[in-house]
């Protein structure tokens, strides 16, 4: 009977030791898993922030390109409208064609200057 008690006692100590080692192993594994999950979460967050920043920058660039195109189109339409209005005024006899010549180069110069200002503003990001 003592042999059985001693044998079971030794076995019990072995099981307790194994449980302690297993508990320690599980705890370490849980710690490492937590670290891994936190690392992935942090990197994912960084990548999301980077992606959002990239998308925002591209959107800003596209908006600048569109606004530049719109301003250019509006300037073209305005110039054509003035040109046609002048043609109508000349054709109807309200003004003489010679009276319109000096203002045309001046308007073109102003349009070119305005185009330059718009391009500079688009390059600076609208600031």
UniProtKB/Swiss-Prot annotation:
<feature type="repeat" description="3; approximate">
    <location>
        <begin position="42"/>
        <end position="56"/>
    </location>
</feature>
<feature type="region of interest" description="4 X 11 AA tandem repeats of [EGSA]-K-T-K-[EQ]-[GQ]-V-X(4)">
    <location>
        <begin position="20"/>
        <end position="67"/>
    </location>
</feature>
<dbReference type="GO" id="GO:0048471">
    <property type="term" value="C:perinuclear region of cytoplasm"/>
</dbReference>
<keyword id="KW-0597">Phosphoprotein</keyword>
<feature type="modified residue" description="Phosphoserine">
    <location>
        <position position="72"/>
    </location>
</feature>
<feature type="repeat" description="4">
    <location>
        <begin position="57"/>
        <end position="67"/>
    </location>
</feature>
<feature type="modified residue" description="Phosphoserine; by BARK1, CaMK2 and CK2">
    <location>
        <position position="124"/>
    </location>
</feature>
<dbReference type="GO" id="GO:1903136">
    <property type="term" value="F:cuprous ion binding"/>
</dbReference>
<feature type="modified residue" description="Phosphoserine">
    <location>
        <position position="67"/>
    </location>
</feature>
<feature type="repeat" description="1">
    <location>
        <begin position="20"/>
        <end position="30"/>
    </location>
</feature>
<dbReference type="GO" id="GO:0050808">
    <property type="term" value="P:synapse organization"/>
</dbReference>
<dbReference type="GO" id="GO:0007268">
    <property type="term" value="P:chemical synaptic transmission"/>
</dbReference>
<comment type="subunit">
    <text>May be a centrosome-associated protein. Interacts with MYOC; affects its secretion and its aggregation.</text>
</comment>
<dbReference type="GO" id="GO:0043679">
    <property type="term" value="C:axon terminus"/>
</dbReference>
<protein>
    <recommendedName>
        <fullName>Gamma-synuclein</fullName>
    </recommendedName>
</protein>
<dbReference type="Pfam" id="PF01387">
    <property type="entry name" value="Synuclein"/>
</dbReference>
<dbReference type="InterPro" id="IPR001058">
    <property type="entry name" value="Synuclein"/>
</dbReference>
<dbReference type="GO" id="GO:0048488">
    <property type="term" value="P:synaptic vesicle endocytosis"/>
</dbReference>
<dbReference type="GO" id="GO:0043025">
    <property type="term" value="C:neuronal cell body"/>
</dbReference>
<comment type="similarity">
    <text>Belongs to the synuclein family.</text>
</comment>
<keyword id="KW-0677">Repeat</keyword>
<comment type="function">
    <text>Plays a role in neurofilament network integrity. May be involved in modulating axonal architecture during development and in the adult. In vitro, increases the susceptibility of neurofilament-H to calcium-dependent proteases. May also function in modulating the keratin network in skin. Activates the MAPK and Elk-1 signal transduction pathway.</text>
</comment>
<dbReference type="GO" id="GO:0005813">
    <property type="term" value="C:centrosome"/>
</dbReference>
<feature type="region of interest" description="Disordered">
    <location>
        <begin position="97"/>
        <end position="127"/>
    </location>
</feature>
<feature type="repeat" description="2">
    <location>
        <begin position="31"/>
        <end position="41"/>
    </location>
</feature>
<keyword id="KW-0963">Cytoplasm</keyword>
<keyword id="KW-0206">Cytoskeleton</keyword>
<dbReference type="GO" id="GO:0005819">
    <property type="term" value="C:spindle"/>
</dbReference>
<dbReference type="InterPro" id="IPR002462">
    <property type="entry name" value="Synuclein_gamma"/>
</dbReference>
